[in-house]
Amino acid sequence: MELRFTTSFEREYKKIVKGNEVLQRKVRKQLALLAKNANHPSLRLHKLGSSKYWSISIDPSIRVLIILERQWIYVYHIGKHEDVY
């Protein structure tokens, strides 16, 4: 599936990974895995209640919110667990 990034995600991404190359690599790795296999166990993909959003884990504290569609994955937000939920 192909990833589509929102403006808000791009803005949040730049802010959260600024100066942190390790986190940058983790985010890129998990997003590449998401595009290849959204059901991979390391993503810890789960639906957020009855909303249209799904969540994946980047590491124990960082989450990315997405919307799954037929041929696209819309990447909406990135942030700390408590901020994104």
Question: Where are each of the predicted segments found?
Answer:
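A short, compositionally biased N-terminal segment around positions ~18-40 that is enriched
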Residues: 18-38
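Enriched for short, Lys/Arg-rich terminal
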Residues: 2, 8-15, 21-25, 58-63, ...
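Charged, low-complexity, helix/coiled-coil-prone segments
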Residues: 1-12, 33, 44, 48
